[in-house]
Each structure stands twice: as C-alpha cells, then as structure tokens.
Amino acid sequence: MSLSNKLSVKDLDVAGKRVFIRVDFNVPLDGDKITNNQRIVAALPTIQYVLDHKPKVVVLASHLGRPNGEVNPKFSLKPVAAELSSLLGKKVTFLNDSVGPEVEKAVNSASNGEVILLENLRFHIEEEGSQKKDGQKIKADKEAVARFRKQLTALADVYVNDAFGTAHRAHSSMVGFELEQRAAGFLMAKELTYFAKALENPVRPFLAILGGAKVSDKIQLIDNLLDKVDSIIIGGGMAFTFIKVLDNVAIGNSLFDEAGAKLVPGLVEKAKKNNVKLVLPVDFVTADAFSKDAKVGEATVESGIPDGLQGLDAGPKSRELFAATIAEAKTIVWNGPPGVFEFDKFAEGTKSMLAAAIKNAQNGGTVIVGGGDTATVAKKFGGADKLSHVSTGGGASLELLEGKELPGVVYLSKKA
C-alpha cells in the first residue's frame, strides 16, 4: 500500500458534478450542543476548495458516536448542520436520512453548489456491516449491504474521503463507492504525506517514541518499527516490563505485563540484529497510589522501586536521556506518553519530552505525533502547531505504524 501516489481532491474536475465528501464530524455533544467543533473546522478547507470549483452539489456524510446500526436521535448530525452553516457562511441543507428516494431527489434537484449534510450513516446497520445485540455481534445481510452501497453511489459523480480517523475501517462509506474517481481530501492527503515521509522514505536517524501500558498491545507496532527505525525510546507503563525482564529490576507495584514479558527477549534480539538502539528509562517518579494526590518519591534502576510504590513517570535523568536521544533524530514518530500526564505530579516527563520534540521540529526535524493520548498531550500542554504533524486518527495511525493496510486508503484511486 503506497501512501504517496493517491489521487487528491486537487486532481479532480468537480465543475457541475455531484461531489460526495466522507468527512469526520464525530464531534462531542452535550444534548444538542457541540462542545468542540475542531473536527468540523478541520474539514472546511476541503469543502471550501470544492465549493470554489463550481460543483452542482456537495454531499457531506459522516458518522457520530455509536448508534449500533439503528436510528437514535441522541446521535443525530442535525446540530452539526447549523454549526457548519455558520462556519461556511452558507446555507446547509440537512436531510433526515443518508440513502433512499427522498435523499436522491434532494441531491439531484440541487444546483449552484448547494451543500447537503446527510443524517448519521451509522443509523443503518449496513454502514458498519454489523451490530451488537445482547452481547452478540450480528452481521448485516450481504445483499442489504450491497444495496446500501449502490444507494450511496447513486448520490455522487466523484468521491472524496477526508475521514482519516475511520480509514482503518472497511465501512460502506469508506470502500463502497463504485465510481472511477475516489480522491483524498486535504486532511487525508496531509496524513498520508507525513506518514509516507516516515514509513516510506525517512531522513535518518529515525526515532520512534513509544509509550502505553502493555507490551502485548504494542507488539505489532514495536516489531514493525524495528525494521524501519534507528532507535526506539520505550517509555510509559510498558518500560517496567522491559527493565524487569532484562535487568531483573525491582518494580514494586508498577505495571507488569505477564504476556508481554515473554515477548521482550525476542524484541531485544531483533533490535540487536537490526542495529536498533533501545532507550529505556533509568529513573522514575514514584507514587504510593494511582492518584493525583499520591505521595511522590523517586527511584532509580539501581535502587529499584520498593513494594507498595509504583512508577508513574520518567525521572530527571531519564528526561535528559530522552531529550538527548530526541535531539539526535531527523525523523520522529511519537506514539504514547512516558508518564501519567493526566495527574500534574506525574506530567513532567511528558512535558519535557514534548519540549524536546518541539525543539527538534524547530531545528528542521520531522516530528509526527500519532493520534489518541499523544495528540491530547500536544493539545493540553500547547505545541500542536509547533510539531510537523499531529494525526487526527488514533486507531488509523496506530495500524499504519503496525504495517497494516488501511482499507479506506487502499480504496482511493491512484494518481494517473
């Protein structure tokens, strides 16, 4: 799966056409009030670009929440239509469904670049292809899924996908359009450009920074990156499993991953074979409980962490070591914080790592932050705009870094 040769919205002739854009408007709601409109704002450049090129109609489609394949007013996209209208400075017509004769009629009778927002795609079981009933997964009928995809295709002449956050899902709106031209929107294209920079053609030295609780959750990630990078910083909870297995360090009540422990020797062996430097913490900030009010202490690899205490952050020497490792790199992919940054007392390791990453980017390095917790870090402590790229897709970026193909990306047309 090449990331760098996909058709972009800029390659399309949209004049007079029905342009279907799969966006990610999965915004947080409090009742019918949007509490954070960032995802809507992020889609504006693609929508505006298409509008500037005289389409017949722009049809926008998204999911919101997890309605489990049935209509649930709580997850309606209706509030998004009003917000989008005020951001675009243009009327947005909201339809009460995403497929069917009424929707087709509204789309086909639109003109002069009208903007239509469809109702939540996931109100139909055929979008995700299954639903949960009494703890069981029930698959959608194959013929019904094919029909749903045909109904979506009937609304469009060209297809644009700007929903990177859902690119790892083979959902109908991501892979179901029987159209010649299936292009990436600006958001999607930016994600692909940056991940291609790292995974297909990195400027070296290439560093991966990995955090998170369990080695077993990140095994595919570590294994894939060991074939690509020059060094890896292992931080967060999973560092304790590494140091206990490798050096028999006492880790007290810190996280230990039994299943992951069995995998550590193989990963270390592969790192040696590939000449990849593994950088582990050498000291820790400890706590007497997993709490923001915990009593804080310090421990080193030499002293070990006594029983009754747990490591919740990287200590001062580890911060220096991590900063020095970051300073040497020219390309960095960061997925997972080095400590429990949600608690102020245990956020210093994460803040110091972010500062080092920002400095690297300002000195010309490429610093890519995977979605999820690490994107939250960049937002919380300020710095998202100073890094090269903060991904909008937690699950999607993780699967890319694990070396998996993303259905929504594979499905995009190649550049001619």
From Swiss-Prot:
> What is any one GO biological process for this UniProt entry?
gluconeogenesis
Pathways involved: Carbohydrate degradation; glycolysis; pyruvate from D-glyceraldehyde 3-phosphate: step 2/5
Binding of CDP, residues: 212, 217, 236, 336, 341
Q: What is its EC number?
A: 2.7.2.3
Q: Name one GO molecular function term.
A: metal ion binding
Which terms are listed as keywords in the entry? ATP-binding, Cytoplasm, Glycolysis, Kinase, Magnesium, Metal-binding, Mitochondrion, Nucleotide-binding, Transferase
Q: Which residues participate in AMP binding?
A: 213-214, 218, 237, 311, 342
Q: Where is it mostly found?
A: cytoplasm
For this protein, the record's CDD domains field holds: Phosphoglycerate_kinase (cd00318)
> What chemistry does it catalyse, as a reaction equation?
(2R)-3-phosphoglycerate + ATP = (2R)-3-phospho-glyceroyl phosphate + ADP
Q: Where does (2R)-3-phosphoglycerate bind?
A: 23-26, 38-39, 62-63, 65-66, 121-122, 168-169
Cross-referenced InterPro entries: Phosphoglycerate_kinase (IPR001576), Phosphoglycerate_kinase_CS (IPR015911), Phosphoglycerate_kinase_N (IPR015824), Phosphoglycerate_kinase_sf (IPR036043)
- What name has this protein been given in UniProt? Phosphoglycerate kinase
